[in-house]
Amino acid sequence: GTFTGYSTLCLAEGMSNDGFIHTIDINEELYDFQRKYFNRSKYGDRIIQHVGNALEILDSINLKFDLIFLDADKENYTIYLEKIVNKLNTKGILIADNVLWSGKVLASISDDDLNTKEIDNFNKGLNQRDDMETILLPIRDGISISIKK
């Protein structure tokens, strides 16, 4: 999700002059809060906010992206992976946050820890894809960076 919009604004710093950022958050109460900060930046008119269920919104966006930053509901990470890989341009980059999940994916995962199982499945699925080249960086809670072939 977008939460406060901080990551969105950081990513905007590296955006090309003709680029746009699409950001999705399920919490409509944060929309105005985010928009206030987006509009204060020089990128406000190039940040497009979507409010609602990200899985549904992704289906409605018929665009290709150079970069996708995934930091969403962990229980759906493998579903997100299937939806967003097709939205990446060739040589597009997928950055996924929280892929170490407080180190839980490195230990034995209990049957009732569904979020950890999902993150583990996401990591394994991403690693097995022939159309993606991936590196996992053990920084804080883990970040994976993948390039679409």
Model-derived segments and their meaning:
Residues G1-K149:
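S-adenosylmethionine/decaboxylated-SAM
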